[in-house]
């Protein structure tokens, strides 16, 4: 029997409002998930509007198959391929809005078989697309101490990174231990490795699990490529609406929008003519409003929305 997992779209109205949807516009939802944002966009489009949604999770693609609408197209792949897909559909410079809802969806977290959560025991996998790449369990068996430490520190911002990495390496080198292939095994190991002085409200494994997930899915590289792709394919006055869920993601989005809003930097001390400065280009986007966070009411209804941040930009 297949278990059904509910997903509540975070900052749904705010992110859709940020797109300033035109009834006959062309839109891209880079993260279909379970379709909350896509269905809302479709409800605001007229007969000539178009929505292209992207996801690399086969379960999301199956969910998208339930939408029978000639205005809707689902694309199976990573959102980093957005610019490529836009070229294939002749959409470059014609897209009126791009939505990116970053991170893991609730169904992915709640389905123990996907291996994303330390709260439910399941196979130690964590791949967004289980048909490609390697599971976390395999990487942890092969990576050296320094690599594991770097991943936990870089992507989990965990000050106990070395201690956790050492515990993982020592565990796998002990031939008496069972192979570490379950999320429960890893969560228990990290909890035991945490110092007795650990006082954070979060579970000791929270940051390490986030780090492994980000690394195994190349999430930050995916986001960087997707943001650049979105800036390229948007039409003038097209909107970019991005929801992030942790500080690493939000910093990337904030810096990207700031950089695109400033335009290229003119090198100091190098005399340039006005024509040469013009050749360097100008600002590509502008920030729309301030960063938006969920209301207390939304957080009460959906505690997972607590860390979310929405940023909106417009193509010039």
UniProtKB/Swiss-Prot annotation:
Grouped into one coarse class, the protein's main location is cytoplasm
Catalytic activities: cytidine(1402) in 16S rRNA + S-adenosyl-L-methionine = N(4)-methylcytidine(1402) in 16S rRNA + S-adenosyl-L-homocysteine + H(+)
Class in the EC hierarchy, top level: transferase
Q: Out of the domains of life, which is the source? A: Bacteria
A Gene Ontology cellular component where this protein is annotated is: cytoplasm
- Name a single GO biological process: rRNA base methylation
Key word rRNA processing present: yes
Q: What is its EC number?
A: 2.1.1.199
Keywords assigned by UniProt?
Cytoplasm, Methyltransferase, rRNA processing, S-adenosyl-L-methionine, Transferase
**InterPro entries linked:** RsmH, SAM-dep_MeTrfase_MraW_recog, SAM-dependent_MTases_sf
SUPFAM superfamilies cross-referenced by the UniProt entry: Putative methyltransferase TM0872, insert domain, S-adenosyl-L-methionine-dependent methyltransferases
Looking at the keywords, is Transferase present? yes
| Record: residues binding S-adenosyl-L-methionine | 35-37, 55, 79, 101, 108
Compartments it resides in: Cytoplasm
* Gene Ontology MF terms in the entry: rRNA (cytosine-N4-)-methyltransferase activity
Similarity annotation: Belongs to the methyltransferase superfamily. RsmH family.
Protein purpose: Specifically methylates the N4 position of cytidine in position 1402 (C1402) of 16S rRNA.
**Full protein name:** Ribosomal RNA small subunit methyltransferase H
